[in-house]
Amino acid sequence: VLDVGTGTAQIPVELCRQNKECRVIAIDMAAHMLDLARFNIEVDGFTQRIYLQQIDAKDMDFEQDMFDCVISNSIIHHIPAPRSVLQESIRVVRPGGLLFFRDLMRPESDEEVSRLVEMYAGAENPHQQQMFDDSLRAALSLEEIREMVTSLGFRDDMVQATSDRHWTWTDRMQDN
């Protein structure tokens, strides 16, 4: 499994907890996030199954068709040119392999942004509220991610709104 934008590596840790055979390469550009990830992996005892690398997701130094599965949670809205991350992920997943991307979904109005910030970050400090507001505004809309997925040769109906603030794209690479 390749985890793109692993952050603190909570998802790879959970994958390894649930599947004794799972091995994960977890990448992130932020050194401070990888430091937190390294700590979490050590605490949970998965240093032999989760491998961290500081890599730019837009230009991954992995062989084509290398991974059975590529996952990514909440990184797309942080990347100015997200299409390149999707292209690279498609390149490195093997035929028949799984693609799983989830991210924030940009609301259709300022009022909806405010409502979501209040609902999900209302108890947080103003800085955290602003970060969530900024993230929602930076996110792709459902229509934008569907258009992007279609332009990459995949079906747009494989991208779904999975909450009031998230979209999820799950698909399999076609066998050659």
Question: Residue locations for each model-derived region?
Answer:
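C-terminal alpha-helical "lid/dimerization" subdomain adjacent to the S-adenosyl-L-methionine
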Residues: L104-T168
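Conserved beta-strand signature within the Rossmann-like core of class I S-adenosyl-L-methionine
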Residues: G97-D103
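A short SAM/SAH-binding and catalytic strip from SAM-dependent methyltransferases
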Residues: C69-A81
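Class I SAM-dependent methyltransferase SAM/SAH-binding core
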Residues: L2-V4, A9-D59
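C-terminal lobe and adjacent flexible extensions of AdoMet/dcAdoMet transferase-like proteins
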Residues: T168-N176
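A short glycine-rich, Lys/Arg-flanked "PGG" loop and its adjoining helix->strand segment in the class I
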Residues: S84-P95
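A short acidic, Gly/Pro-enriched loop at the edge of an enzyme's catalytic core
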Residues: K58-C69
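Short N-terminal helix/helix-N-cap motif within the alpha/beta-hydrolase-1
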Residues: H32, I79-S84
